[in-house]
Amino acid sequence: MVRSWTFERRWVDGTVLKRPEPAAVGIVGGGQLARMLAAAAAELKLPLVVQTPHADDPAVALASDHILAPLEDVEATRELARRCRAISFENEWLDLERLAPLEAQGVRFLPDLQSLKPLLSKRGQRQLLDELHLNTVRWIPLEAVLPPPPAANPDPWDAGADPAAAMLAPSTTGSGLAPQVVVPDPPGPRLPEGFQFPVIAKASEGGYDGKGIRLLNDQADLERLLEEVDPQGWLLEEKVPFERELALTACRDDHGNVACFPLVETHQHQQVCDWVLFPAPTGHGVELYARNVAVSLLTALNYVGVLSIEFFWGPGGLQVNELAPRTHNSGHYTIEACGSSQFAQQVRIVAGLPMGSPEPRWNGALMVNLLAFRGDEPAHERARQALAALDDAHLHWYGKKGLQLGRKLGHLTLPLQSSDREQREAERERQLRRIREIWPLPPLNRP
């Protein structure tokens, strides 16, 4: 039985808001992540309200209530705050300057805006990782490749110069003509010492699922990029050789308690997550190091909420690739495979409830993203029904409109029975082949 009492918040304008507890959880965003947060809230018997632009956005169908407004509409977020105990975000595309006045007036964002600030851009993430001395990919801001500005030409009227003497000085050419001055071509952009092609160029903000990423193979690619983008908004990273891509989702509550889900392997198709394997086929020491990285980040930021970390594993050891201040595609398997899912953890934290157990309930799991393939709506529907009929398969359909090639339409999670690493890998391959016979991958040449 959940106790109920009156909660009061006094705004700076004197307005007093009274409401019963437990209060609603507020989410800015209405996509598939918000939809799964709403499903988790419903299981916990907690109301959840979303702010999202369209009535047919995925989360609206499962949320307790909704506010139809653009995500950047601050007045709509103010209204969301009036209905909710605290607010969290579905994604990191935030305008902190617009939200800061609300936080100053008492609106509670989790994570708070100060914790989010270094995580909203790839450049900010890289700087944070460097400050914490965490192993990450070597990088430089794109403007570092630009040549220094040319030195100013000497001005004959500068102090200490004798303009008359300069004008009366005899010619050294013997012809009476002023000598020709050869102006060298300005130097072009250059990679700094220690970097060599190929390198990865990334937009600092807004990139996801392969968007905002370019492979630069040579000097011509670099010069072409500089003609097309503002260098201040991009960075360059060394192209890292790696054996596997890994990910870990971690949570921290208001009291500083930290819980980590198991380390997983992720696989990409055209830079979009294709499948996730739990547990990752690595040693215990690798997972322990990943958990230490998570604790370091959460503690340094005084972060409250769910944080997801992507890693490279290879010759350079375990290197942090990117951070996501939210629930993450790599953690969808936790809905069935763990005691408390990443979505339930986020809802619990925002609602002020104790975290649940992240411990696994299965020996292993395979999560497969269902990306829109080449085909019409009936073809996708037939494939969806076939997947739903599979034994032991847990289908999550997001209810999105439109079949843009490669779009994430849902995901499927299947248990893996073996506790032996090699046998589990063989089981993963069998299950994946079975899924791909029903739901093919989109072609490699998608736009």
Q: What kind of region is each of these model predictions?
A:
Residues 118-247, 251-297:
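Active-site nucleotide/adenylate-binding loops and adjacent lid/helix of ATP-dependent enzymes
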Residues 335:
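A conserved FAD-binding loop/helix module that cradles the flavin
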